[in-house]
Amino acid sequence: MFIGRNRELETLNGLYRSDKFEFVVIYGRRRVGKTALINHFIDEKKAIYFMGVESNEKQNLENFSKSIIEFGSGIQAETTFSSYQAALEYAFKLAENERVILAIDEYPYVARSSKSLASTLQMSIDKYKDNSKLMLILCGSSMSYMEDNVLAYKAPLYGRRTAQMKIEPFDFDECCTYLRGLSDEDKAYIYGIVGGTPQYLLQMNDSLSVEENIKNTYLNPMSFLYEEPLNLLKQEVREPAIYNAIITAVATGHSRMSEISTKVGESTTVCSGYLKNLISLGIIKKETPYGEKISKKSIYSIEDNMFRFWYRFVPDNASAIARGAENLVYKRIESQLNDYMGRVFEEICTQYLWKLLLTGKMPIEFVSLGRWWGNDHRKKAQIEIDIMGEKDSASAVFAECKWRNENVDLDVLETLVDRSGLFHYTKMHYFLFSKMGFTKGCAEKAKLMGNVTLVTYNDIVRSQK
């Protein structure tokens, strides 16, 4: 069953209906659902689908030829075009009088095996686009390759595309459609454990508990997810050992460049290059305090929840897992799970605020959201604000998120209001997010202030319906 991607499908179908040449670039990290999106889109349409393989030019050209000829003749073909130029010319002619889709999946594999393919595509597009109704789709999992060799200004195909789509992991709302059999609370835990990558969500069984799902995947050496982070690095980068060391450093609390460099034993210049690649892969993110464009206070953290959970709990327990001690390891994880979920809940709350903005329900229409941390000069202490967002120099929203098994008390609201005093806004609105709820004192104060919104986790879940 295909779930989600409504916006992407709407765009693709709109381009399909244009009845003229279209060239769409689709890219995104592995397992995110690009192939599923393409297959769902081309279903019941006249389409040639070809997936490149990590092989030589001869093998890929043979496979490409078969895909095109079988579409054109309706019979299995043994003929191979003499070149990609001849194959593409045939595909363009097939679409002279009717809409035909040509989808080339894993394009980087094909292009790496044939160095002239990009230029051949460019020439074919320029020659035939005005007299063809072909809809060309190039799709790739190597994001750096797609960005540098397809989308970049110096790439041969630059300026030819009519649309591009970077396919991102699902947000929390979309993930919940995969997890309908779970309780509302368990949906949050599963999102925190695997994130929004469809292939990882499919490893979760919504008829089992969170404990059973963790044991069956991360604590099972024979499972797909147990080896996934290292396998993914081996597929994406040339020196997986160094990348693994950097991710491990970040996962163990070394968040600043100098700390990562010291932990890994490489210069900051070297680490910077590796971190840049990890950011492009969607594994690591770089944050600066909200409102500060360039800051020495920048920190790095793991963005992908599957990577974050794996690196926090699997490596240190690898020996016990290998000996089949999943019950013991789970007890260790369970004691830290609510603490781990704190950052996940902030992510869910951030998505909720964006949803309020997009539906016209935000009291202050911010232009962006982020975390803030820094020095409180009044108290000479380092402080944090979970979420803040500015509309303009006069107005902003502030939020605090608490994932804990107790009601949020008045002191949390008072602390947030106090910290907002470090900024010079004249109009402010506050959000308190709570897993469980709020004390009577907190609720009464919020009502009295008039510029406070109290949101429980259940409120967030109900907003999906």
Whereabouts are the PLM-identified features?
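A cross-kingdom feature that marks ATP-driven nucleic-acid transaction machinery
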Residues: 290, 299-465
